[in-house]
């Protein structure tokens, strides 16, 4: 793989992995606010899947970049994350949460699907495996959408006005898709423009049907001003401090609890052979 293609490939994979990483924490945060025990267990399962996908991609990229294990999760700051900017704003209500997560799930899948038949070894298998789990996420969210109250549906229509333009911007424009070196080299097996169209035809059309919306002409697109193409977000933007603290806590007790498994295992290995435990009472 050419060095330029390698850098672009890593950046694109991080856009997917980091968006999954943030979305997984959305599910964790909202988990105890479910309307029923079934809701809570569903969010727990979706969080587990989503964070599992993010960490699998992190491990894959750490191998690609010859980085130490867990570097991508614990070794970056909030300004280095490639997440979808839409997820930086917390949900205002239940309807907003459903709209935002449904949009995010659909967008992640369509972007990931552009690597489904990649010439890069190992990528296609991950896409197929992740796709099966993401399908059930979307089914669950569709069920919540269809069973929503009239009040929640109005909240969803309002949320569409703010959430959808940011999600569409994530796919960037036609010109970038046409000049994509990853597509021409076969690393990406279908174009981002095709992914954007599929996102509109599937995810957005389902939302419009569920919300009895005739069209989205009232939704104003966002111009790509000072756009960071590699991170697919506004240049210089970073995760809000409260969201980042929830993802990577800094207080001492939580840091101990959130240590990578490899570190925890090393700390406890041969515990009784250590000097501090070798003295008789």
Where are these regions (language model features)?
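Extended, helix-rich structural scaffolds rather than catalytic motifs
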Residues: 154-281
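Conserved alpha-helical segments that form or flank metal/cofactor-binding pockets of metalloenzymes
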Residues: 47-75, 141-146
């Amino acid at each position: 793989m050419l060095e330029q293609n390698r850098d672009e490939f890593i950046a694109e994979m991080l856009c997917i992995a980091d968006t999954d990483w943030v979305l997984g924490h959305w599910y964790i945060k909202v988990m105890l606010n479910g309307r029923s025990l079934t809701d809570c267990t569903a969010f727990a399962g979706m969080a587990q899947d989503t964070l599992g996908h993010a960490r699998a991609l992190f491990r894959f990229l750490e191998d690609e970049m010859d980085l130490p294990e867990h570097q991508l999760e614990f070794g970056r700051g909030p300004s280095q994350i490639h997440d979808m900017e839409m997820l930086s704003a917390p949900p205002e209500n239940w309807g907003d949460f459903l709209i935002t997560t449904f949009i995010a799930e659909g967008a992640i899948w369509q972007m990931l699907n552009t690597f489904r038949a990649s010439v890069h070894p190992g990528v296609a298998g991950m896409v197929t495996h992740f796709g099966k789990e993401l399908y059930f996420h979307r089914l669950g969210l569709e069920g919540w959408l269809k069973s929503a109250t009239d009040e929640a549906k109005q909240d969803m229509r309002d949320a569409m006005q703010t959430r959808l333009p940011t999600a569409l911007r994530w796919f960037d424009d036609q010109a970038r898709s046409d000049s994509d070196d990853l597509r021409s080299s076969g690393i990406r097996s279908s174009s981002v423009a095709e992914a954007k169209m599929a996102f509109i035809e599937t995810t957005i059309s389902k939302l419009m049907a569920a919300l009895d919306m005739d069209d989205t002409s009232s939704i104003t697109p966002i111009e790509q001003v000072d756009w960071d193409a590699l991170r697919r977000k506004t240049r210089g933007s970073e995760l809000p401090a409260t969201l980042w603290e929830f993802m990577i806590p800094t207080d001492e007790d939580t840091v101990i609890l959130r240590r990578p498994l490899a570190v925890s295992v090393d700390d406890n290995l041969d515990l009784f052979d250590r000097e501090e435990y070798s003295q008789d009472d």
